[in-house]
């Protein structure tokens, strides 16, 4: 009878390990898909702004923000932007894996970076000599043009 209890314990432990492993992989795939989707939204937002500014060049000089109606895309809570210094700054809160997804989808664009202590850092962590608008918070991923 003792061997039967040991057998059941081994089967239960193995099953628990397998289930936990599968759950972890599933969570990882879900996070990766979420990052890919957010990166696509980020890029779509930047492209819509650039398309709008190509047709309305006076807005690049005037600066400010554009509405989702002006851009012709659905609004998003995860991506923000501002037009300042005749540049477009688009940013999103940094989450694990988002930078990697953006680098992949943007072909490792040199215009991609992160903001730390009010300074723009490139993807390698080097400070860039670009003055950021004060509305851009720390700990965000930023793409500019």
Model-derived features: positions:
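Aliphatic-rich helix starts adjacent to a transmembrane/signal segment
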Residues: 16-40
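N-terminal pilin/flagellin-like segments and related low-complexity appendage regions
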Residues: 23, 28, 48-53, 57, ...
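N-terminal single-pass transmembrane signal-anchor helix
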Residues: 1-25
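Short, contiguous, well-ordered secondary-structure segments
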Residues: 9-12, 30, 51
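N-terminal alpha-helical signal peptides/signal-anchor transmembrane segments
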Residues: 35-59
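Short, surface-exposed interaction loops/tails
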Residues: 90-145
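Extracellular/periplasmic head regions of type IV pilus-like filament subunits
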Residues: 54-107
């Amino acid at each position: 009878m003792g061997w039967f209890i040991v057998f059941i314990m081994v089967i239960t432990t193995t099953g628990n390990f397998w289930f936990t492993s599968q759950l972890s992989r599933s969570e990882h795939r879900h996070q990766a898909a979420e990052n890919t989707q957010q990166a696509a939204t980020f890029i779509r937002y930047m492209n819509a702004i650039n398309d709008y500014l190509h047709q309305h060049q006076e807005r690049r000089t005037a600066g400010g923000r554009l509405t989702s109606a002006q851009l012709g895309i659905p609004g998003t809570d995860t991506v923000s932007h501002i037009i300042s210094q005749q540049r477009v700054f688009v940013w999103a809160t940094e989450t694990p894996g988002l930078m990697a997804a953006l680098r992949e989808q943007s072909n490792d664009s040199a215009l991609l970076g992160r903001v730390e202590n009010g300074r723009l850092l490139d993807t390698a962590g080097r400070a860039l000599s670009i003055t950021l608008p004060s509305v851009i918070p720390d700990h965000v991923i930023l793409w500019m043009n």
